[in-house]
Amino acid sequence: MATILQHLPVGQKVGIAFSGGLDTSAALRWMKNKGALPYAYTANLGQPDEADYDEIPRKAMEYGAEKARLIDCRTQLAHEGIAAIQAGAFHISTGGITYFNTTPLGRAVTGTMLVAAMKEDDVHIWGDGSTFKGNDIERFYRYGLLTNPALKIYKPWLDQKFIDELGGRAEMSAFMTKEGFGYKMSAEKAYSTDSNMLGATHEAKDLEFLSSGIRIVNPIMGVAFWKPEVDVPAEEVSVTFDEGQPVAVNGKEIADPVELFLELNRIGGRHGLGMSDQIENRIIEAKSRGIYEAPGMALLHIAYERLVTGIHNEDTIEQYRLNGLKLGRLLYQGRWFDPQAIMLRETAQRWVARAVTGTVTLELRRGNDYSILNTESPNLTYAPERLSMEKVEDAPFSPLDRIGQLTMRNLDISDTRGKLGVYARAGLLSLGGNAALAQLEDGGAKKK
């Protein structure tokens, strides 16, 4: 049997990642009517726009599920979010504003935990609502098969028969009404939203046009800080780390990582911290655009990186950032649990994060406008007396030391001049006149 099934497996158990929305509700009922045995699995990821998780499995049973389970994924999601912070696993940014890979992190947790729950129920066929144009279809494919190598994939949105009968939201709404459930479509927004405890993604529809921006978005994790009528008073906040683990906010210890993120989201959200507008490359190398929220992740990232720069040396910081860019791409591609990703992640957790102990105090204002007010750590290698402009006792180096350093470190100046002369004679570089190197004489090579 092929791994990806193009037709409904009649008479067999089919697990569906069930959100309770129109798409998965119609798909579940349709599969039931066509003779499959649907099993519904709902991930509790702490979605900020979900009011009642317990109601979702009840809906699934009402629509014909053989069994419906709510899987609490919040603790695992929090741990993965902290791991991403520790490793700097973020590769998408614009103008210094970062996207924190919150959807890829959510898919890593959902894809593994839901399939593990299905295995417990002897369900080995899985479907979800991802489309063939997006990233999620590949992420779920990888995480699902990683968790259960015997897994088969059935997606209604890849089944032509389903598409012919229920190809649009209007058709799905009419179908559910005909089935006696009176399902009414919610008011259409100008964009679609997907969220979890770590962040929210707004994309598609009007946001596909770059002429539409953040001003059409209604934030679900924070405030519309760009609106002048929205009052956003400045606020001081401190974040404390112990060996790379965030342990306290404003001096209050929070042992539960879920509660920690909820508190960080509340604080950062009051300012709209962590909102960004990104153009990114999907896995299939086509560009897409999204507007993102991640107030808690942003707050952790700022505090963590401040400690990293105060504690570690330049080469360690450079390697942390290079590895983080690579790890961010692997995470985005659905490879968070692949060996190459584990190697990069655990390297950062062991050799970078374990030294990150201390407290950073910030003032948050509107959006991503903030100031760092204080940095405290027993592991700081920042030592102002080394470079003080004032006279200090037992100075670590003298003027003579610097003379020696300048001489030895810059023996290559004559070599550089020579190379510039070679480039000038080859017509690659202009010396003199109005050129950038106008004052540099071509004396770097021996004249014949």
UniProtKB/Swiss-Prot annotation:
Does the record's keyword annotation contain NAD?
no
- Provide the E.C. number(s) assigned to this enzyme: 6.3.4.5
Pathway listed: Amino-acid biosynthesis; L-arginine biosynthesis; L-arginine from L-ornithine and carbamoyl phosphate: step 2/3
What is the annotated localization of this protein?
Cytoplasm
Query: Gene Ontology cellular component?
Result: cytoplasm
Q: Which Gene3D superfamilies match?
A: 1.10.287.400, Argininosuccinate synthetase, chain A, domain 2, HUPs
Q: Does the keyword Nucleotide-binding apply?
A: yes
Q: Which residues bind L-aspartate?
A: 131, 135-136
Q: Where would you say this protein principally sits, based on its record?
A: cytoplasm
Residues that coordinate or bind ATP? 17-25, 43, 129, 131, 136, 194
Record-listed L-citrulline binding positions: 99, 135, 139, 192, 201, 203, 280
Q: Which UniProt keywords apply?
A: Amino-acid biosynthesis, Arginine biosynthesis, ATP-binding, Cytoplasm, Ligase, Nucleotide-binding
Report which reactions are catalysed by this protein: L-citrulline + L-aspartate + ATP = 2-(N(omega)-L-arginino)succinate + AMP + diphosphate + H(+)
Which Gene Ontology BP annotations are present? argininosuccinate metabolic process; L-arginine biosynthetic process; urea cycle
Do you know which PROSITE patterns this protein is assigned to?
A: ARGININOSUCCIN_SYN_1, ARGININOSUCCIN_SYN_2
Q: What class of enzyme is it?
A: ligase
Q: Which SUPFAM superfamilies match?
A: Adenine nucleotide alpha hydrolases-like (SSF52402), Argininosuccinate synthetase, C-terminal domain (SSF69864)
Kindly state the subunit structure of this protein: Homotetramer.
Give the record's family classification: Belongs to the argininosuccinate synthase family. Type 2 subfamily.
Know the name of this protein?
Answer: Argininosuccinate synthase
Source organism (scientific name)? Acidovorax ebreus (strain TPSY) (Diaphorobacter sp. (strain TPSY))
